[in-house]
């Protein structure tokens, strides 16, 4: 019984790794992060409904726990329609979970995100490409929308999913640990 259970777990893990290995690298990720591979992926759900799938792309030698200083990309593929302003406002709430943000900085970041984040529908993708010690570039369906060249913004924004203070620790573990949360 124990060996059958172990074999099932190994087969499931191998399937998950194979599924991620077959995932095509998005053009914006390939251009900004040569040799990119999926570190992990997970579904974000609200009241049981799928909202989006997040995928963390890292370079071939990346250590995912060093996410704050590593070149990486966070890709979000939406399963439903959301307003860009709502995404921006919720992002700021989540960024504040990591610590206090000065009021003027929060207003500047919110204004930038409202300009960068379009309204999305099912199948639309938003990608944040981390440029360590520079900031983030944002893409919508592989088209560059703009950048926020503030390293603190980059760390706080990526921290929504990757910081210990995230509101979604299971999603974080799946992204950083190379697992897959469905």
Q: Where are the regions a protein language model picked out?
A:
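N-terminal signal peptide c-region/cleavage motif recognized by signal peptidases
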Residues: 16-18
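Terminal leader/tail segments of proteins
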Residues: 21-182
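N-terminal secretory signal peptides and thylakoid transit peptides that target proteins
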Residues: 1-13
């Amino acid at each position: 019984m124990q060996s059958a259970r172990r074999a099932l777990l190994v087969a499931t893990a191998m399937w998950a790794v194979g599924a991620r290995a077959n995932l095509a690298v998005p053009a914006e990720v390939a251009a900004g992060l040569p040799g990119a591979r999926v570190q992990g992926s997970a579904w974000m759900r609200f009241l049981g409904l799928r909202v989006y799938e997040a995928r963390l792309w890292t370079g071939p030698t990346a250590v995912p726990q060093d996410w704050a200083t590593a070149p990486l990309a966070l890709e979000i593929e939406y399963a439903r329609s959301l307003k860009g302003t709502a995404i921006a406002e919720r992002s700021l709430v989540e960024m504040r979970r990591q610590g206090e943000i000065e009021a003027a900085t929060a207003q500047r970041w919110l204004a930038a995100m409202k300009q960068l984040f379009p309204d999305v529908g099912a199948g639309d993708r938003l990608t944040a490409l981390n440029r360590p010690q520079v900031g983030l570039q944002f893409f919508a369906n592989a088209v560059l929308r703009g950048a926020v060249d503030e390293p603190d913004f980059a760390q706080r924004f990526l921290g929504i999913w990757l910081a210990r203070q995230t509101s979604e620790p299971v999603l974080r573990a799946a992204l950083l640990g190379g697992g897959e949360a469905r």
